[in-house]
């Protein structure tokens, strides 16, 4: 009923073959585990980076506090925005921001002007500090910076009833949109709320 193997050579060969198969399986399992651990670490770091970028785009925004236009010969020649940090935002450098201008007769993207002369703006905008110590960077939520755009340099000056969509994109990629609406009458005005 039971068979006994008495030959020592055969018994050793079967044991070595089994041992080789076992070692091969352990090596394959170890390599697979290493690949899985590396992949999991890579995916975790990618997920973390994506989460941080998404968080920055949502939280590192600006708020537009007010907007007004300078009136010259019954046309708005300068559009001025007063901006501040949104709640919970990091420092926002407006010199690294862009403004998309979609106006009555032209759409373009404005970049920050490097010129010290704020009156010669073309398709650029400039900034000046209202409250705070920096003309370009919003450091605290109490800081206020005026963003100046020359409508005549972008396209034509804005007339009564015109509308401009302004979208400010910060260096983090967050966007804030403001609709500047020129009042129906500009007669005898020096400045108007937009």
From Swiss-Prot:
One of its GO terms (molecular function) is structural molecule activity. It comes from the Archaea. Keywords: Archaeal flagellum, Glycoprotein. One of its GO terms (biological process) is archaeal or bacterial-type flagellum-dependent cell motility. Coiled coil: none annotated. Glycosylated. Residues 1-12 form a propeptide. It is found in: Archaeal flagellum. InterPro entries: Flagellin/pilin_N_arc (IPR013373), Flagellin_arc (IPR002774). GO terms for cellular component: archaeal-type flagellum. Belongs to the archaeal flagellin family. Flagellin is the subunit protein which polymerizes to form the filaments of archaeal flagella. This is Flagellin A2.
């Amino acid at each position: 009923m039971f068979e006994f193997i008495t030959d020592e050579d055969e018994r050793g060969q079967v044991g070595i073959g089994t041992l080789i198969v076992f070692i091969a399986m352990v090596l394959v399992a170890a390599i697979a585990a290493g690949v899985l651990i590396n992949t999991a670490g890579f995916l975790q770091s990618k997920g973390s980076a994506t989460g941080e970028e998404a968080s920055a785009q949502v939280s590192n925004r600006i708020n537009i506090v007010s907007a007004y236009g300078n009136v010259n010969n019954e046309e708005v020649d300068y559009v001025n925005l007063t901006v501040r940090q949104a709640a919970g935002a990091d420092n926002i450098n407006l010199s690294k921001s862009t403004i998309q201008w979609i106006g009555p007769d032209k759409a373009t993207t404005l970049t920050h002007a490097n010129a010290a002369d704020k009156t010669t703006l073309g398709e650029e905008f400039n900034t000046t500090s209202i409250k705070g110590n920096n003309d370009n960077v919003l450091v605290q939520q109490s800081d206020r910076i005026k963003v100046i755009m020359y409508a005549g340099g972008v396209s034509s000056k804005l007339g009564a009833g015109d509308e401009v969509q302004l979208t400010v994109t910060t260096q983090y990629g967050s966007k804030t949109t403001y609709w500047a609406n020129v009042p129906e009458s500009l007669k005898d005005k020096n400045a108007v709320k937009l």
